[in-house]
């Protein structure tokens, strides 16, 4: 009878043994993958359009990868430099397109504004005609006359006056930066600097992941762009992220969104923040609030042409909090403005705060590498605590 229990052939026994060993290897790899997954800090980057999310990602690459070198992580410095130069070369076209879009948008707006803006030098009209004639030319090759006309128009006081009213139409933030660099960009051997690449605006849509390591800690940053209408469908997919970094264009208080040309951009950001803060899938995930574009906010406030109270009447009654810590040499008007915007967001987070998640505000300038380095270092302890709490280790 005992023989009946051992009726398997040698081949069958060997096959079962091999299967058990394969299962052990798979289980071991799964455990390893699980440990790596749990040890990785996953950051979800959110914010309204043109708030600076993609620029934050670029800064992470400059600071913690190998700059603008494709996938990053090359051990060979020469290969890293080669890849970096290659990517920079491919970005030249994007930068030239930004330059072209900037001058086209400004001169097209001159006749559409109310009241319209006239050229300071009427003899420049033929230059305006040229710029408008090439507006929709596909695969534009940027001949020398383009740069000549663009530079002459940018030096026209009427064009500058129209630029000063750019909150009345849709103009990319980097317009002045690249228009001021026409003589550099037009050179045949032009290679963009890191600052040029940080300023370059390319519309993002979809979800992009950037991986980097800081002091042997792995970070995965997910940049979500162009998803205004689809947000409610995919947001639940990120309910296990370590933290949300919410980016706000603080300078957008006097601008409207591209989608409808009516909704105030800062109000749109407040509405989006509220929807994320109260989202049932994210109720345990804390938010690091990047109050971005502080440089542009300061310029607007000090220029005095667009007053915050004209768009947010409650600002007229706002006083700077006693615990405010201005930057060295910062004008009190700028301090009051930036803390008002901060408190508008904190009002949302404290109104529905249940102790399960918190909001940590920071003032940022995404094109300033040292500012982002300092802010991200300040955030790392917060992120680490969130990570420990996420896996009930704290």
Swiss-Prot record:
- Provide the binding site for GTP: 47-55, 197-204, 223-227, 292-295, 366
Q: Where is the G-alpha domain?
A: 39-394
Query: Segment G3 motif: which positions?
Result: 219-228
- Looking at the UniProt record for this protein, which Gene Ontology cellular component terms does it annotate, in alphabetical order? cytoplasm; heterotrimeric G-protein complex
**GO BP of this protein:** adenylate cyclase-activating adrenergic receptor signaling pathway; adenylate cyclase-activating dopamine receptor signaling pathway; adenylate cyclase-activating G protein-coupled receptor signaling pathway; sensory perception of chemical stimulus
Q: Where is the composition biased (Basic and acidic residues)?
A: 7-25
State its role: Guanine nucleotide-binding proteins (G proteins) function as transducers in numerous signaling pathways controlled by G protein-coupled receptors (GPCRs). Signaling involves the activation of adenylyl cyclases, resulting in increased levels of the signaling molecule cAMP. GNAS functions downstream of several GPCRs, including beta-adrenergic receptors. Stimulates the Ras signaling pathway via RAPGEF2.
Put simply, this protein is called Guanine nucleotide-binding protein G(s) subunit alpha
Q: What is the species listed in this Swiss-Prot or TrEMBL entry?
A: Cricetulus longicaudatus (Long-tailed dwarf hamster)
Q: Gene name, please?
A: GNAS
């Amino acid at each position: 009878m005992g023989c009946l229990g051992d009726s398997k052939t040698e081949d069958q026994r060997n096959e079962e043994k091999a299967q058990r060993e394969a299962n052990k290897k798979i289980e071991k790899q799964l455990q390893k993958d699980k440990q790596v997954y749990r040890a990785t800090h996953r950051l979800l980057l959110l914010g309204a359009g043109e708030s600076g999310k993609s620029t934050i990602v670029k800064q992470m690459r400059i600071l913690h990868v190998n700059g603008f070198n494709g996938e990053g992580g090359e051990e060979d410095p020469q290969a890293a430099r080669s890849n970096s130069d290659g990517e920079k070369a491919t970005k030249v076209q994007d930068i030239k397109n930004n330059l072209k879009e900037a001058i086209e948008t400004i001169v097209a707006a001159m006749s559409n504004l109310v009241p319209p803006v006239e050229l300071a030098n009427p003899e420049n009209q033929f230059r305006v005609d040229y710029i408008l004639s090439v507006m929709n030319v596909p695969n534009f090759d940027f001949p020398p006359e383009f740069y000549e006309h663009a530079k002459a128009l940018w030096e026209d006081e009427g064009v500058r006056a129209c630029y000063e009213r750019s909150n009345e139409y849709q103009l990319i933030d980097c317009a002045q930066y690249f228009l001021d660099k026409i003589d550099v960009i037009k050179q045949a051997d032009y290679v963009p600097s890191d600052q040029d690449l940080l300023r370059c605006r390319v519309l993002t849509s979809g979800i992009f992941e950037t991986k980097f390591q800081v002091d042997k800690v792995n970070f995965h940053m997910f940049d979500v762009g162009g998803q205004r209408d689809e947000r409610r469908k995919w947001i639940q997919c990120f309910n296990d992220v370590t933290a949300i970094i919410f980016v706000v264009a603080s300078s957008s208080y006097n601008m409207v969104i591209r989608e409808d040309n009516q909704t105030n951009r800062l109000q749109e950001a407040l509405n989006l923040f509220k929807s994320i803060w109260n989202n049932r899938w994210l109720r345990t995930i804390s938010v690091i609030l990047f109050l971005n574009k502080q440089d542009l906010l300061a310029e607007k406030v000090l220029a005095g042409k667009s007053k915050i109270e004209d768009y947010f009447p409650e600002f007229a009654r706002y006083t700077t909090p006693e615990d405010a810590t201005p930057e060295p040499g910062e004008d009190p008007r700028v301090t009051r403005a930036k803390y008002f915007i901060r408190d508008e967001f904190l009002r949302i987070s404290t109104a529905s705060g249940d102790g399960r998640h918190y909001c940590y505000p920071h003032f940022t300038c995404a094109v300033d590498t040292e500012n982002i380095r300092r802010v991200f270092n300040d955030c790392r302890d917060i992120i680490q605590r969130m990570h420990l709490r996420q896996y009930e280790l704290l």
